[in-house]
């Protein structure tokens, strides 16, 4: 029996905390919602609210709730079947959260998002304003991807990455990724008894990504690899991220108190400004740009804009104002940014000096291909 929350250490100054609850946490590995465990999770969130912290819930479980409500129907494994279950289950899921938080006199507000809500800068800002309005009025936002209408093209993809984007929208201090694993290990603990828990991560590199693998649970869409992606995005925005076991007693309150639980990802000392956060978290890249060694050095070490002279190759089709990824000639991802020229135009000015752009195209949108204010180093 764990001690009551009131006996625990004092919580740090008021924070905004995103709690991401995966399907495996909400179902306990079964085919239906584990309501007893949801009660416990809500108790901890209510404790945080009592002490002035703002809490955002990013919840999975709509499809599981829909399947349970319809008495586990046999459906074809299609997008339409998933959307059917999500449409039925989302209303059941929000009712569960509303009922449980109501025990503590707390109100919830539902936000259903798609990729399209984040791609467009104006819609992104509207979503941010709505989220902040809920928080400022003492309402707990309960966020999920709108699976009932989301197609492959407009899906965020998983609630791990969605929670990172929501954390950026809400100006969060912490993102708690609760899963069925205690954290990130040096090997898969399910088949390697020598695997050790990684307590703290300062840099996310290829070695760490390989450790994360790519497996996912049967009911959910996110594995450890997607959690690592989410952590990388969030920490660049100045958000501390912790991956921990959702079944651990008092896990939410302990993490909020700063206890050493799970795997902690330290945020960058100098987080990205608002516009660059949107570039990192918002629109998916529409194409790729390969740059030479000189341009790579200028972008990475001097924070320079990307000039057409340094471009070696343009891949994919994108329009002016869309986001592209930037690679070096070895295929290493360096950055992403908003393009001043379309892929057609860029292909024509590859390797050209800035003063040659007008001569080649017959018009110009400035001397740079991507301005440094629109460029985010990865």
UniProtKB/Swiss-Prot annotation:
Binding annotation for substrate: 60, 147, 159
Instruction: Write out the residues that bind ATP.
Output: 20, 179-180, 221-227
Q: Which reaction does it catalyse?
A: L-glutamate + ATP = L-glutamyl 5-phosphate + ADP
The UniProt entry's GO biological process terms, in alphabetical order, are:
L-proline biosynthetic process
Annotated Pfam families: AA_kinase (PF00696), PUA (PF01472)
Pathway membership of this protein? Amino-acid biosynthesis; L-proline biosynthesis; L-glutamate 5-semialdehyde from L-glutamate: step 1/2
Provide the Gene Ontology terms for cellular component. cytosol
- Entry EC no(s): 2.7.2.11
**Swiss-Prot/TrEMBL keywords:** Amino-acid biosynthesis, ATP-binding, Cytoplasm, Kinase, Nucleotide-binding, Proline biosynthesis, Transferase
Q: Which GO terms describe its molecular function?
A: ATP binding; glutamate 5-kinase activity; RNA binding
Q: Does the keyword Transcription regulation apply?
A: no
Mind telling me what this protein is named? Glutamate 5-kinase
Query: Native species of this protein?
Result: Photobacterium profundum (strain SS9)
Gene name on record? proB
């Amino acid at each position: 029996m764990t001690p009551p929350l009131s006996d625990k250490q004092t919580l740090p100054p008021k924070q905004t905390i995103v709690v991401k609850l995966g399907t495996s946490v909400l179902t306990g590995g079964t085919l239906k919602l584990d309501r007893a465990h949801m009660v416990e999770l809500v108790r901890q969130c209510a404790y945080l609210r009592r002490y002035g912290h703002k809490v955002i819930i990013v919840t999975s479980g709509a499809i599981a709730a829909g399947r349970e409500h319809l008495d586990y129907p046999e459906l074809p494994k299609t997008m339409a079947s998933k959307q059917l279950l999500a449409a039925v289950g989302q209303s059941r899921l929000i009712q569960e959260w509303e009922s449980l938080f109501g025990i503590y006199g707390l109100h919830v507000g539902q936000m259903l998002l798609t990729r399209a809500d984040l791609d467009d800068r104006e819609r992104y800002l509207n979503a941010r304003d709505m989220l902040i309005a809920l928080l400022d009025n003492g309402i707990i936002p309960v966020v999920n991807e709108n699976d009932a209408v989301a197609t492959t093209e407009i899906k965020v993809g998983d609630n791990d990455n969605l929670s990172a984007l929501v954390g950026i929208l809400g100006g969060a201090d912490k993102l708690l990724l609760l899963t069925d694993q205690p954290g990130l290990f040096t090997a898969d603990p399910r088949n390697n008894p020598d695997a050790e828990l990684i307590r703290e991560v300062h840099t996310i590199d290829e070695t760490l990504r390989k450790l994360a693998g790519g497996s996912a649970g049967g009911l959910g869409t996110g594995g450890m690899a997607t959690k690592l992606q989410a952590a990388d995005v969030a920490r660049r925005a100045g958000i501390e991220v912790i991956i921990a076991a959702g079944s651990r007693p008092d896990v939410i309150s302990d993490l909020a108190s700063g206890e050493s639980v799970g795997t902690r990802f330290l945020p960058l000392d100098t987080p990205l400004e608002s516009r660059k956060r949107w570039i990192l978290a918002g629109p998916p890249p529409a194409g790729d740009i390969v740059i030479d060694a000189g341009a790579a050095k200028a972008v990475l070490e001097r924070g320079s804009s990307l000039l057409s002279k340094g471009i070696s190759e343009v891949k994919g089709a994108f329009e002016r104002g869309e986001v592209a990824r930037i690679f070096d000639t070895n295929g290493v991802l360096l950055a992403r940014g908003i393009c001043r020229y379309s892929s057609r135009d860029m292909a024509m000015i590859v390797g050209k000096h800035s003063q040659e752009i007008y001569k080649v195209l017959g018009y110009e949108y400035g001397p740079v291909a991507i301005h440094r204010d629109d460029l985010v180093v990865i």
